[in-house]
Each structure stands twice: as structure tokens, then as C-alpha cells.
A protein has these predicted regions:
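Nucleic-acid substrate recognition interfaces
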Residues: 1-386
Length: 386
């Protein structure tokens, strides 16, 4: 029997406390948990076993076993992230290196320095994390509860004491995943069949926000490479996704591009919105054509360096995020049951520009997408021509 495909969904909401005393109790707990995470990280660097770290964290910071487990889990995640990116784990700055470097500048003063110090304290001391478990109504320490059609988050602050905060969040659109979470919570309350959900509390600009993450069952893959693929070049010139449709035998059927210009100078939220719209357009195209998606295995995209004489190009490359767009396409494809094929990017730009672009009268951005297609057919046997 095949295992069900699952995807993790993370949802954000704001918390409103009933009294200032409850809010201060949670802030004090967040400061202790943040310190416990840093302590656990240092002990892991020293080579201490996880079980011993967990016991020492619980005893030293007055946290229950589940909070201590959460601090250890966070510390392990930070350590593994450094190792995956080939970074020195001893140089991690809790609170953010960019803020740390800004605060080191002696010429900052007044309101600007006060804002940076507040942001530094919030990022360094404003964290609380509890891993979900199915046996304890989904989560032992941070648990949503209903009362008179209102949703509250029950927070364990230690010594068998709990405080409650009202969850402030409304569904923003018709298919908002927040409605899915509320439906699953209501069903679990009625049937007693709970599901694990992980809750993270963070302090941002004086407000406490909760991030609730849980797993969602995905539909089986129904759109496969058997009917052909749509090759996507995420870093086509000039910084837009280009696509080319191929038949099962590899012949070109159609091609085009998804306009994504004017990204430079935009705020991060607006850039993310445009990237999501582009990803939805790719998925809409794949569903309409009934074909799988072929993507390049992108790593280490050059963005230029200071002194190369092209500051304008460096600025554009710095604000263009093909990896972010790739991740969004993968997320949406999993939800829609569309297969995503990875191919090696070696020489696709050269082959596309020198062979397929003149042969099929394609542009410089669309040619490499045509070069992706001869390679996906061999991935059926786990092979690659390049």
C-alpha cells in the first residue's frame, strides 16, 4: 500500500490577550525559551547528546518536557541548515547578522538606533515553539480552543497555569487554507480524532503572532510525463519565465513566455505576490495542456560581484528570485497532482541558443526551454543525457 502524499501548510494569525498580565507572562516565557534554544545550540556544538541537552534545558530554564523538546528541535534545525549551506555553525548570530552589523555602527543614534534595537530584541528574545503530537489533542502546550464561536489559543506558561489569547484572523479568499484548519479542528473536537499541529509564537513590532503548521493530504499524481512535458526556463532573458511544450516523442508543439517585468524596486510583499501569480500561471498552463512540468536543477546562479562594471545588472539579478519561483511552482504542482521532472541545466542555454533558437525561430529566452525536453525522456529510467 502506497503512503499518502502530504504537504505542510503554515498559517499566520495575530493574538489578542485578555489582560496585560497574561501578555507579560507569555513574553517572559518567550524570553526563557529563546535563551533555552541558544543554550541547546551551544551544547550541540560541543557534542553533547540530545537527551542530555533536553534534560539540562528543562532543569535550567524551568520548561516542561515538550517545550524543552521544542528548543532542542529548533537548535538542531539551525545546525543542520548551516551544514547544508556549508556555513560555519560557530558563526551563527541569533537575532540576525544584518541587524547585528547595523547595530555595530557607531554613527547610528536616535530614533533609527532605537528601532534597530527593538527589532534585535524581538528577533533574539521573541520565540516560542511547540511540536505537535497526535496523542495530546494535537499539541500539549499551545492548543486552539473554541468558546462561543470564537477561537482562542491556550498557552501553557508553566506550573500548571494556562493563559488564553483570542485568535484574530479571517479567511481572505474563497479557498483560504484557514477555513481548512478551522474545519479540521471542529471535526477533531466532535470526533476525538486529533491531528498533530505545530505552533510557533513570534514577537513582531510589539505584536505576538502565531504560526500554525499541519500536514494536508495531497491528491495522487494524475498529470504525468507520459503525455509530454512543458519545459520551464526560470532565468530566461530578460528575467522572466519562458516555456515550451513538447509531445511525448519530444517534438515542439508550442512556446511562449510569462511576463514578469518591473520586479526591481518593489517591496518584498509585492515581489512575492507577483511570483505567486506567475507560478499559478504555470500550473494553469500545465493543467490546460495535460502535461508534466520540466524544471532545471538550479544551483549557484551567478549574480555578479562588486567592481564588475555592471551595477544595474547586479541590482536586477539581486531582486530576481528564480529559486523562489521554482519552490512556488513545486508547491502548487503537488497540490494539483502534477508531476515535476528535474533535468540537468548543463549546456541548455548554449544548446538552446545555438541550435533550437535558429532552427525553430525562437527567442533567446525560449530556446533553452526547448533544450530541456530531450533530457526528460531519459529520466523515466533514472538517467540523464547530460
Amino acid at each position: 500500500m502506497k503512503k499518502r502524499r502530504k504537504a505542510t501548510i503554515a498559517l499566520q494569525c495575530r493574538l489578542r490577550f485578555e489582560t496585560q498580565e497574561d501578555r507579560e507572562a507569555v513574553l517572559y516565557l518567550m524570553r526563557r525559551f529563546s535563551s533555552a534554544t541558544r543554550f541547546a545550540y551551544q551544547r550541540l556544538l560541543e557534542g553533547m547528546e540530545g537527551r542530555e541537552v533536553r534534560q539540562r534545558v528543562a532543569a535550567l530554564f524551568g520548561l516542561n518536557d515538550r517545550y524543552a523538546h521544542g528548543a532542542l528541535t529548533k537548535a538542531k534545525a539551525i545546525l543542520s541548515s548551516c551544514q547544508e549551506r556549508d556555513q560555519n555553525p560557530k558563526k551563527v548570530v541569533f537575532g540576525g547578522r544584518r541587524l547585528f552589523e547595523q547595530l555595530k555602527r557607531r554613527h547610528l543614534s536616535g530614533k533609527r538606533r532605537a528601532e534597530l534595537k527593538r527589532a534585535w530584541r524581538e528577533r533574539r528574545q521573541g520565540l516560542l515553539f511547540a511540536v505537535g503530537e497526535k496523542g495530546n489533542r494535537g499539541n500539549q502546550n499551545l492548543r486552539p480552543e473554541w468558546e462561543e464561536s470564537r477561537l482562542f489559543l491556550r498557552i501553557s506558561v508553566g506550573h500548571r497555569r494556562w493563559v488564553r489569547a483570542e485568535v484574530i484572523r479571517k479567511a481572505k479568499r474563497e479557498k483560504d487554507r484557514w477555513d481548512l484548519l478551522l474545519a479540521r479542528l471542529a471535526r477533531a473536537e466532535a470526533t476525538g480524532e486529533w491531528f498533530p499541529y505545530t505552533v510557533t509564537l513570534r514577537l513582531r513590532e510589539g505584536q505576538i503572532y502565531a504560526f500554525i503548521s499541519f500536514e494536508e493530504d495531497l491528491p495522487p499524481v494524475s498529470v504525468t510525463r507520459d503525455r509530454g512535458v512543458i519545459g520551464i526556463d526560470l532565468n530566461a532573458f530578460p528575467h522572466h519565465p519562458a516555456w515550451a511544450e513538447a509531445s511525448p516523442d519530444g517534438n515542439l508543439l508550442a512556446h511562449g513566455a510569462i511576463p514578469l517585468t518591473g520586479m526591481e524596486g518593489l517591496r518584498k510583499a509585492e515581489r512575492e505576490r507577483r511570483l505567486w501569480l506567475a507560478a499559478y500561471e504555470v500550473i494553469r498552463l500545465a493543467k490546460a495542456k495535460g502535461k508534466a512540468i520540466a524544471l532545471e536543477r538550479l544551483k549557484g546562479i551567478p549574480r555578479g560581484q562588486r567592481g564588475d562594471g555592471r551595477p544595474g545588472l547586479r541590482r536586477k539579478l539581486g531582486q530576481w528570485a528564480p529559486r523562489s519561483l521554482e519552490e512556488k511552482i513545486r508547491i502548487l504542482a503537488r497540490r494539483e497532482g502534477i508531476e515535476v521532472v528535474e533535468v540537468s541545466p548543463a549546456y541548455t542555454s548554449i544548446i538552446g541558443s545555438l541550435k533550437y533558437a535558429p532552427q525553430f525561430l525562437l527567442g533567446a529566452g525560449v530556446g533553452p526551454t526547448r533544450a530541456l525536453e530531450p533530457f526528460w525522456r531519459d529520466t523515466r529510467q533514472g538517467e540523464s543525457r547530460i
